[in-house]
Regions:
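Active-site flanking residues adjacent to catalytic metal/cofactor-binding acidic residues
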Residues: 4-6, 216, 275, 347
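A short secondary-structure junction motif
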Residues: 123-125, 287-290, 366
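Divalent metal-dependent hydrolysis catalytic cores, especially in the metallo-beta-lactamase
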Residues: 8, 79-90, 103-124, 153-161, ...
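Well-ordered mid-protein domain cores that form the structural environment of catalytic cofactors
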Residues: 129-136, 140-141
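Mid-to-C-terminal alpha-helical segments outside catalytic/metal-binding sites
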Residues: 1-4, 12-90, 94-104, 108-109, ...
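Short glycine-enriched, charge-decorated loop/helix-capping segments at active-site entrances
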Residues: 126-130, 360-362
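Flexible loop residues that form catalytic
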Residues: 9, 115, 188, 220, ...
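Catalytic pocket-lining loop regions of alpha/beta-barrel enzymes
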Residues: 131-134, 147-153, 160, 166, ...
Length: 388
């Protein structure tokens, strides 16, 4: 049985950006470890809160997590959970060590996304947006250089912003030539335009023609929240949990735009993987999108008949896969209530949300599952879907 891991990461060396592009790094001050922690833990949440209502960001980080990181910043040991996840192993950023780590777990191939490699881009978008695309170019070339000679098993994901479509098409084309078969694209409007806006057609066409899968990953999109939800008398924990609930809307809105906007119909070779955004929303989502297309009972607010040739759920099964992450998702019963092959395996290595033992942990959860479910989940579905 082949095992394909559709969501893993580099844990880039702390000085990767300064080493990869010292001239650009000099124009964009380095984020501290504390700033990176805040960006990881509450960055997407914080951006939805008006500046006047924003509390101290460290107050949004759970007390124990904050204390552990404060000890780490003062020269102590890193958080045990991060150690256990493998973030400090050579396999976190060195290709030969990564391949040995994969071999020990029976993993054949991995898609690899950034960790701190994404931070210069986010930092630039807040402080020097004119440099943002250059930070992505720097990361994309660092990542493809890192796995050079191993792209048969280690599949680098380019990071793409659609704010400049000419740049996006050129970058995805260049990165495909360097071995990238996936592209991390924010599951959000770009340049205040929906993902199905005509301006983006050239990019979706290029991705489909190049055989580059689109990745909608956590942290690359957020569901809009009314700012008033943050104005609750100072209960930041309650607000944080509301924001966590809202994240399940991110993939639903992004996929809805791609389906109902006709993007998947116009580009049948386009492939999308939703990563680390949960799986428990899937059964309800599949039912809801098909109800929206049921012309026997048109809804008043739909305003017109559904005219695409396939049911929305059929576009999902043809062109979408959704991956799990161990600290968030339990396979059963969700995987029993969606079409076989829709939910696929990932380890999230070396992030704490995943597990180094993800293969065995998920294998145990699949005991007694329907025939073929295990093989499809671990690799058969992703292999056929991605053509790898």
């Amino acid at each position: 049985m082949r095992i394909i891991d559709v969501d893993s990461h580099f844990q880039e060396p702390f000085d990767w950006f300064e080493t990869a592009n010292p001239t650009l790094a000099a124009k964009l001050p380095r984020m501290s470890v504390a700033e990176q922690l805040i960006d990881i833990a509450v960055g997407d949440l914080f951006s939805s809160v008006p500046p006047a209502l924003r509390p101290d960001p460290l107050k949004l980080v759970p007390d124990e997590v904050r204390k552990v990181y404060e000890r780490f910043l003062a020269g102590g040991d890193p958080p045990q959970q991060i150690i256990d996840a493998g973030a400090f192993l050579p396999a976190a950023h060195l290709p030969e060590a990564r391949l040995a780590w994969m071999d020990a777990r029976g993993i054949d191939k991995q898609i690899i996304l950034p960790s701190s490699g994404y931070h210069p881009y986010r930092h630039a978008m807040r402080n020097a947006p004119e440099l943002a695309l250059q930070t992505l170019e720097t990361y994309n070339r660092w990542a493809t250089d890192r796995v050079h000679g191993h792209i048969d098993r280690l599949i680098p994901a380019a990071v793409i912003d659609l704010i400049d479509v000419d740049w996006a098409v050129a970058e995805i084309t260049a990165m495909r030539a360097r071995g990238a078969r996936a592209a991390f694209v924010k599951a959000d409007p770009h340049d205040n335009k929906a993902l199905n806006h005509p301006d983006f057609e050239r990019f979706w066409a290029a991705a489909a023609d190049l055989g580059v899968a689109i990745l909608f990953h956590v942290g690359g999109g957020r569901a809009a929240m009314h700012p008033g939800w943050a104005n609750n008398g100072g209960d930041t924990t309650a607000f944080f949990r509301l924001a966590s609930l809202s994240r399940r809307m991110v993939p639903q809105l992004a996929l809805g735009a791609m389906i109902f906007g006709g993007v998947l119909e116009r580009h049948p070779k386009l492939r999308i993987i939703v990563q680390e955004l949960g799986i428990d929303w899937l059964p309800d989502f599949l039912m809801a999108i098909d109800l929206e297309a049921d012309n026997s009972r048109p809804r008043v607010l739909s305003f017109s008949l559904y005219r695409l040739p396939l049911k929305p759920s059929e576009y999902v099964m043809r062109q979408v896969r959704v991956s799990v992450v161990y600290q968030q998702d339990v396979l059963r019963p969700t995987i029993d209530h969606v079409p076989k092959g829709l939910v696929v395996f990932s380890s999230d290595f070396p992030h704490a949300e995943g597990s180094q033992d993800a293969v065995s942990l998920y294998d145990a959860q699949l005991e007694g599952a329907a025939a073929g479910t295990r093989e499809s989940f671990f690799g058969k579905s992703a292999e056929a879907f991605l053509g790898i």
